[in-house]
């Protein structure tokens, strides 16, 4: 992949596509007798959520609240646009709005032939962009150093922002501020809180040397998945059908799967004002089971 600059934030978003669904290559096969064994679908969904999710310590999962602005740098324009189109398609399927041309990118995707050196320079130049507060917004200093020194083909860093669930006002003190923000409390409740966690921005760095031989379509699906959710960079989904296995040769898939789509849809439909983070993850797992069941019952697409 040639390293010429293409600013994806300046390019027009594609027209709204149909909702994103996992692609299916083969028609279903009729099986007369099926014996179900192993863990229940509910257990599998809870395990999937537990493995892939990586919110800041003690926090509920964050998601984009209304809109995203996608930028791609250091790729030829045609490759950059393909990534923008795919990430936009996934965002639109989650009822997000795509920023207009010229918007400030909050999903920044950068390709580099010296990924670690480039990442370290970014963090050194703008440390508060990666850790804007002492806690609650990111995975912490140890995780940031792992991000800087990662050997992964694709690395990412999410920054979330706790905000008042009713007003959207920031609910955390940032570096350099002396007084904490005042957060209005809705009322005494053990189930519902007064804040939600919104994604503020994500930086995704692609090592061009390590993604050679991978089609831009498959890579775009992988990038879209990590752009839309706080995915654990150390996630191990061996034996699970997921685009997150792209760099796991034994379990590699070529597109976003039913499990991936179900997770994103469940995340974006879950209540964000849960007072207890585990209540949110339980809701996501329950919704995933419904989504995966619906996907398995859908008719196979025509070739």
How does the language model describe each region?
Residues 28-32, 60-75:
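Acidic/histidine-rich, surface-exposed loop or edge segments in extracytoplasmic proteins
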Residues 1-9:
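Sec-dependent N-terminal signal peptides
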């Amino acid at each position: 992949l040639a390293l010429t600059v293409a600013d994806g934030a300046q390019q027009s978003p594609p027209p709204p596509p149909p909702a994103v669904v996992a692609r299916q290559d083969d028609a279903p096969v009729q099986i007369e007798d099926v014996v179900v064994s192993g863990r229940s679908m509910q257990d599998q969904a809870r395990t999937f959520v537990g493995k892939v999710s990586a919110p800041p310590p003690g926090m509920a999962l964050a998601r984009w609240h209304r809109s995203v602005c996608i930028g791609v740098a250091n790729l030829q324009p045609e490759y950059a646009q393909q990534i923008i189109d795919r990430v936009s398609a996934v965002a639109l399927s989650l009822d997000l709005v795509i920023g207009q041309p010229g918007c400030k990118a909050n999903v920044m995707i950068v390709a580099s032939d010296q990924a670690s050196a480039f990442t370290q320079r970014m963090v050194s130049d703008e440390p508060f962009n990666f850790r804007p507060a002492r806690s609650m917004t990111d995975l912490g200093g140890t995780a940031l150093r792992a991000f800087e020194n990662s050997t992964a083909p694709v690395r990412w860093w999410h920054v979330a922002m706790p905000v008042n669930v009713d007003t959207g006002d920031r609910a955390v003190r940032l570096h350099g501020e002396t007084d904490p923000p005042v957060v209005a409390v809705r009322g005494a409740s053990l189930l519902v809180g007064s804040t939600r966690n919104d994604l503020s921005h994500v930086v995704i760095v692609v090592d061009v040397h390590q993604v050679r031989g991978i089609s831009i379509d498959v890579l775009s699906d992988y990038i879209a998945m990590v752009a839309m959710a706080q995915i654990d960079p150390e996630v191990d989904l061996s034996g699970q059908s997921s685009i997150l296995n792209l760099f796991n040769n034994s379990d590699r898939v070529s597109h976003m799967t039913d499990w991936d789509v179900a997770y994103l849809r469940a995340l974006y439909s879950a209540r964000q004002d849960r007072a207890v983070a585990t209540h949110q993850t339980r809701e996501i797992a329950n919704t995933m089971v419904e989504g995966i069941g619906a996907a398995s019952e859908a008719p196979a697409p025509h070739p």
